[in-house]
């Protein structure tokens, strides 16, 4: 049985001063040394939150775009927001003013290859005029066009509407209808459009199945093998595997026509069975859930890690209900939450721990550290100046405080 040998001594003021300097240097190199194996299992993240307190028009974020000028556009259920890294500016619908948004409920934001900024709302789609800081709503036969999805293609941008697909052609600056459903049964919004191969595009109508659209023939066909009635998200990864989430039934993975994986909260580490969005980053699949934070799946071995809000940990992820994921050009992930605004997620290579109430798992019992020691099992033992001994588990990232040493000054720890 291992015991810890603790030696409490008095030092001169000069030695204390020198020791603190030496300890800070040692602390830096120590954590650089142990950080690499920890990072390979569970990276450190820095979170930046933009919510109502920062000026966001509403807390449910439905879409995000980082444009070519570096501005971050944020669409909510109640207005469009533009963030210039210093300030948030709101854009709202004003009745009777055709130069404003047609609706405050923003469904997507897109920037095409000509740097046109598109904003889709529940009452139509519009183009943003940067010169006049205003919007122009597009129409078809004199009526606003409702679209729910987009896809950038050669020579223009595809727009998926209710039983309809349009193409905005750069050469003519006109909107051309490519497909109209003949049967009213198929007047369903296409909520997602993803390219499957050179000719075919997959369309997710959510409650009415998944369809394929042929870019050469303009034919739309329902894929009969998808028989569920609530597809919340579809995603084609870099290995050409199709990931499909079904409301309340987890995540499916298909290789061609074959189902190769089905992850649920009961048969895997998936933290929640309701999934809102899927995004790939650095050979990992990020999965946004409705109550379990973000699950991150390795595309090599299908292993899981997750980012979640933890009770009593003020530095943990700020929300567990995530509606939208967006990967910006700098490879930073943004998470649009349902109640906590927009959360920026950035990889960092170090983290800091501060003093917390005694017994809290996510910090030190005293912020002044006198000594520490890593034992043969990889556990880090920390001696504090008046808070006793702290035990840190690098794998879980949690601390344990020892009441028997609560007010002690611990200046040396060894193993025997």
Segments (PLM) and residue ranges:
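Carboxylate-rich, polar loop motifs that coordinate divalent cations or form catalytic acidic clusters
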Residues: 7-416
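Short, small-residue-biased leader/transition segments that mark boundaries at the very start
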Residues: 1-6
């Amino acid at each position: 049985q291992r015991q810890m040998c603790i030696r409490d001594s008095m030092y001169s003021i000069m030695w204390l001063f020198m020791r603190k300097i030496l300890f800070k240097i040692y602390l830096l190199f120590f954590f650089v040394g142990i950080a690499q194996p920890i990072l390979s299992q569970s990276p450190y993240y820095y979170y930046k939150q933009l919510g109502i307190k920062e000026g966001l028009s509403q807390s449910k974020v439905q879409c995000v775009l980082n444009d070519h000028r570096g501005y971050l556009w944020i669409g909510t259920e109640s207005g469009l927001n533009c963030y210039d890294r210093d300030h948030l500016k709101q854009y709202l619908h004003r009745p009777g003013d055709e130069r404003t948004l047609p609706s405050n409920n923003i469904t997507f934001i897109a920037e095409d290859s000509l740097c046109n900024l598109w904003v889709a709302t529940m009452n139509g789609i519009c183009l943003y005029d940067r010169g006049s800081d205003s919007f122009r709503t597009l129409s078809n036969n004199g009526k606003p066009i409702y679209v729910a999805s987009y896809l950038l293609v050669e020579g223009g941008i595809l727009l998926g509407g209710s039983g309809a697909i349009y193409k905005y052609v750069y050469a003519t600056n006109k909107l051309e209808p490519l497909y109209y459903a003949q049967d009213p049964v198929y007047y369903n919004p296409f909520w997602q459009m993803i390219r499957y191969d050179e000719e075919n595009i997959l369309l997710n109508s959510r409650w009415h199945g998944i369809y394929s659209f042929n870019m050469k023939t303009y034919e739309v066909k329902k894929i009969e093998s998808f028989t569920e009635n609530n597809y919340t998200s579809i995603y084609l990864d870099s290995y050409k595997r199709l990931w499909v989430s079904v409301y309340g039934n987890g995540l499916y993975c298909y290789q061609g026509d074959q189902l190769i994986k089905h992850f649920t909260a009961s048969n895997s580490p998936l933290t929640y069975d309701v999934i809102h969005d899927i995004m790939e980053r650095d050979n990992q699949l990020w999965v946004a859930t409705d109550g379990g934070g973000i699950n991150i799946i390795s595309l090599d071995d299908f292993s899981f890690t997750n980012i979640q809000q933890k009770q009593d940990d003020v530095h943990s992820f700020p929300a567990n209900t995530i509606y939208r994921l967006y990967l910006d050009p700098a490879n930073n992930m943004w998470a649009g939450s349902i109640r906590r605004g927009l959360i920026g997620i950035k990889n960092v290579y170090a983290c800091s721990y501060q003093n917390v109430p005694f017994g809290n798992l996510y910090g030190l019992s005293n912020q002044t550290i006198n000594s520490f020691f890593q034992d043969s099992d990889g556990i880090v033992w920390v001696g504090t100046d008046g808070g006793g001994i702290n035990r840190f588990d690098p794998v879980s990232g949690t601390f344990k405080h020892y009441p028997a040493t609560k007010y002690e000054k611990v200046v040396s720890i060894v193993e025997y």
